[in-house]
């Protein structure tokens, strides 16, 4: 049985999350509370929300945990060529926090294999919008000829980035944003991006599962460090993947 959380209640230990033999491995608790304070408490303990419209807020701590080391991002030969072209072409831009809510809404409207509807509900948009206004949630956006064509968003605490979702309206547009983000994070000493759950797509980008215990230990160490400031970069971060040898598919 999972724990029901009232607003003042702490999270239970992550070891109490449902195990792999259950119908919902990793499910830890449920609540109605989705305040910024609750979200920050969750992230600092390796917990994240994921639920559908009409459900209570469901809190998860999966084991293993899917993570991506920024320096191990996999760049295919074709994507490397695209990045080189983008660096030369002024029609392409990387913008940070241009319109955070618009990025969330674009992610919400993107069809996902095996998913009906979206977990990015109005309440989720409002909650993460509050974190964005606090300077703790950010969007990385790929623009082409004045139009947002892809991007991603996530939460940044200390030297830890928690990726939430991405979208692409042009081929590789979300990968372009991720490549820029990884270049920026690597320069600032971030060694792990939380990807939450295992998927083939994340694995193709270089993400790997690690034991939850290892993930939690890393979060406790890095989330307590000073936040990155300023959170600003542009497409020049893409040179990380074009000017020197890096992992290729």
UniProtKB/Swiss-Prot annotation:
GO cellular component, one term: cytoplasm
Substrates-to-products reaction catalysed: N-terminal L-lysyl-[protein] + L-leucyl-tRNA(Leu) = N-terminal L-leucyl-L-lysyl-[protein] + tRNA(Leu) + H(+); N-terminal L-arginyl-[protein] + L-leucyl-tRNA(Leu) = N-terminal L-leucyl-L-arginyl-[protein] + tRNA(Leu) + H(+); L-phenylalanyl-tRNA(Phe) + an N-terminal L-alpha-aminoacyl-[protein] = an N-terminal L-phenylalanyl-L-alpha-aminoacyl-[protein] + tRNA(Phe)
Domain of life: Bacteria
EC number: 2.3.2.6
Gene3D superfamilies: Leucyl/phenylalanyl-tRNA-protein transferase, C-terminal domain, Leucyl/phenylalanyl-tRNA-protein transferase, N-terminal domain
Coiled-coil boundaries: none
Keywords: Acyltransferase, Cytoplasm, Transferase
GO MF, any single term: leucyl-tRNA--protein transferase activity
InterPro entries according to UniProt: Acyl_CoA_acyltransferase, Leu/Phe-tRNA_Trfase, Leu/Phe-tRNA_Trfase_C, Leu/Phe-tRNA_Trfase_N
Entry keyword Chaperone: no
Subcellular location: Cytoplasm
Enzyme type, top EC level: transferase
Pfam families: Leu_Phe_trans
GO terms of biological process kind: protein catabolic process
NCBIfam families, sorted: aat
The protein's role, per its UniProt record: Functions in the N-end rule pathway of protein degradation where it conjugates Leu, Phe and, less efficiently, Met from aminoacyl-tRNAs to the N-termini of proteins containing an N-terminal arginine or lysine.
Family: Belongs to the L/F-transferase family.
Stated name of the protein: Leucyl/phenylalanyl-tRNA--protein transferase
Source organism of the structure: Cupriavidus metallidurans (strain ATCC 43123 / DSM 2839 / NBRC 102507 / CH34) (Ralstonia metallidurans)
Gene it is expressed from: aat
């Amino acid at each position: 049985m999972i724990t029901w959380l009232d607003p003042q209640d702490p999270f239970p230990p992550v070891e109490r999350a449902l195990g792999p033999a259950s119908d919902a491995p990793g499910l830890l608790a449920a609540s109605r509370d989705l305040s910024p304070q609750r979200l920050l408490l969750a992230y600092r303990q390796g917990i994240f929300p994921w639920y559908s419209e009409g459900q209570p807020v469901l809190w998860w701590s999966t084991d293993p945990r899917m993570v991506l080391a920024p320096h191990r991002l996999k760049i295919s030969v074709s994507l490397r060529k695209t990045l080189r072209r983008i660096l030369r072409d002024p029609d392409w831009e990387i913008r940070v926090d241009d319109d955070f809510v618009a990025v969330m809404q674009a992610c919400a409207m993107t069809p996902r294999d095996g998913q009906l509807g979206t977990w990015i509900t109005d309440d989720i948009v409002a909650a993460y919008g509050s974190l964005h206004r606090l300077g703790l949630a950010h969007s990385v956006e790929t623009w082409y000829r004045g139009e947002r064509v892809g991007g991603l968003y996530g939460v940044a605490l200390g030297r830890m980035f928690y990726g939430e979702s991405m979208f692409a309206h042009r081929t590789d547009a979300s990968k372009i944003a991720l490549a820029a983000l990884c270049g920026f994070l690597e320069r600032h000493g971030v060694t792990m991006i939380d990807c939450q759950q295992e998927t083939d797509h994340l694995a193709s980008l270089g993400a790997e599962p690690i034991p939850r215990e290892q993930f939690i230990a890393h979060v406790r160490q890095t989330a307590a460090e000073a936040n990155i400031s300023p959170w600003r970069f542009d497409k020049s971060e893409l040179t990380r993947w074009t000017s020197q040898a890096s992992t290729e598919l």
